[in-house]
């Protein structure tokens, strides 16, 4: 069975992974993954469909019980997960969704503050079905950060949103992470999204990390910056995308 994530001691890395493997029946999904993520670092994970991205995130979150696996996996005790589907409980109000597990006046105050941070002040008593898709993801972000996690895991959180809403959510996530300073692992198919947000970008291919790229661009990122374009070309090549006049790596 897959090992449960261990708890990190204070002043260590937010994520420590060594030789991580995961298998489903006879198929190897993760094959000897090594990774460290520093406290407060924003890391994006790219890869083609079936490369093992979501399996890796679920392993970090401790959500892969019953899956065969080996390796060392250490994460902080306080972590939150955001998925593409906001996964709000339809029978609870917005603030009730945000404050699940929190009690008393302090919990309500923390919930109101979290909703204000994501631009939803005054929507505390709304029902999830009264919100747009983008607003539902804002609630999911508020819920994930209300407990000040040391690690935020995000699995394609904006994949179902339209292009304009995605850009707005990029700005919001950047602001929230700068304020709360969790370590972040963002799983995405969107190369530009990864470059726009991350300090480092990883590429996973057939269960192995084949790229670990530091993004040394000022924020907010300018898509017209020639260096942005160069990072895009390099990453697309590692993802097997052939560009005119170039061969994929």
Curated annotation (Swiss-Prot):
Residues 15-231 form the ABC transporter domain. The keyword Transport applies. Its EC number is 7.6.2.14. Signal peptide: none annotated. It is a peripheral membrane protein. GO terms for cellular component: plasma membrane. One of its GO terms (biological process) is carbohydrate metabolic process. Its main location: membrane. It catalyses: ATP + H2O + aliphatic sulfonate-[sulfonate-binding protein]Side 1 = ADP + phosphate + aliphatic sulfonateSide 2 + [sulfonate-binding protein]Side 1. It is an enzyme of class 7 (translocase). It holds the Pfam family ABC_tran. Keywords: ATP-binding, Cell inner membrane, Cell membrane, Membrane, Nucleotide-binding, Plasmid, Translocase, Transport. Gene3D superfamilies: P-loop containing nucleotide triphosphate hydrolases. The keyword Glycoprotein does not apply. One of its GO terms (molecular function) is ATP binding. It comes from the Bacteria. ATP binds at residues 47-54. It is found in: Cell inner membrane. The complex is composed of two ATP-binding proteins (SsuB), two transmembrane proteins (SsuC) and a solute-binding protein (SsuA). Part of the ABC transporter complex SsuABC involved in aliphatic sulfonates import. Responsible for energy coupling to the transport system. Belongs to the ABC transporter superfamily. Aliphatic sulfonates importer (TC 3.A.1.17.2) family. This is Aliphatic sulfonates import ATP-binding protein SsuB 2. It comes from Rhizobium johnstonii (strain DSM 114642 / LMG 32736 / 3841). The gene is ssuB2.
